[in-house]
């Protein structure tokens, strides 16, 4: 089990509440900062997720930790019957709703404030479930994964997009330098929440990846 990393170490709130508070605070400039910090690569990764999901021709899609809705907007091109974006941060969802309205996709995409560990859906509801850069923010990873399995249809597809730590030189050293030093500096300069991007860096570095994460999924 990975170490529990929280945004605000001096707060008495649980991780779930802290994560919601943090993303509410940074929601308005999250998209712009995300493009800068990821060097735009996050867009390419999301396109790959859409490609994988599209092969299943899903009718019901759920995007967990949907944030400002980048992925649900892209998945609208798959023409499913229904797309639901779920997130614990109302602030992020408000930004996403404005983007969806601008794209005239409000009749296709539904945005819901909700907890990934206690989702308001029946068993076996979705043909496809996606989580992009969100599982490391789960307060209880095992519980969140079990809840995903509950609402996913038996023949459905789950696609999780997450950062991981490179293991080979020089990528390992370059990644650590960027995430430990450059990313927090960018966050402190441009973000309203000075600790948010330090948390995002720390949580990414401590989260299980590769075989370790696959073992969690297979439990």
Whereabouts are the PLM-identified features?
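A short glycine-rich, Lys/Arg-flanked "PGG" loop and its adjoining helix->strand segment in the class I
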Residues: 142-157
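Class I SAM-dependent methyltransferase SAM/SAH-binding core
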Residues: 60-64, 68-118
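N-terminal auxiliary segments of SAM/dcSAM-dependent transferases
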Residues: 1-20
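Conserved alpha-helix/loop element of class I SAM-dependent methyltransferases that forms part
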Residues: 29-32, 38-59, 74
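C-terminal alpha-helical "lid/dimerization" subdomain adjacent to the S-adenosyl-L-methionine
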Residues: 17-18, 88, 161-217
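Short catalytic micro-motifs in class I SAM-dependent methyltransferases
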Residues: 133-134, 162
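Hydrophobic beta-strand segment of the Class I
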Residues: 30, 129-130
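A short acidic, Gly/Pro-enriched loop at the edge of an enzyme's catalytic core
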Residues: 117-128
């Amino acid at each position: 089990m990975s170490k529990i990393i929280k945004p605000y170490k001096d707060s008495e709130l649980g991780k779930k509440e802290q994560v919601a508070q943090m993303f509410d605070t940074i929601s308005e400039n999250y998209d712009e900062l995300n493009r800068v910090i990821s060097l735009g690569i996050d867009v390419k990764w999301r396109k790959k997720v859409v490609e994988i999901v599209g092969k299943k021709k899903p009718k019901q899609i759920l995007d967990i930790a949907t944030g400002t809705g980048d992925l649900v907007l892209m998945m609208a091109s798959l023409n499913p019957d229904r797309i639901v974006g779920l997130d614990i941060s109302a602030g992020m969802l408000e930004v996403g709703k404005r983007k969806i309205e601008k794209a005239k996709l409000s009749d296709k995409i539904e945005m819901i404030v909700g907890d990934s560990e206690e989702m308001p859906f029946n068993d076996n509801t979705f043909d496809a479930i996606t989580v992009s850069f969100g599982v490391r923010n789960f307060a209880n990873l095992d519980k969140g994964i079990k809840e995903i399995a509950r609402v996913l249809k038996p023949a459905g597809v789950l696609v999780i997009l997450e950062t991981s730590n490179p293991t080979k030189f020089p990528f390992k050293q370059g990644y650590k330098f960027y995430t430990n030093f450059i990313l927090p500096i960018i966050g402190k300069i441009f973000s309203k929440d000075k600790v948010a991007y330090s948390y995002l860096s720390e949580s990414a570095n401590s989260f299980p990846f590769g075989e370790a994460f696959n073992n969690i999924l297979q439990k």
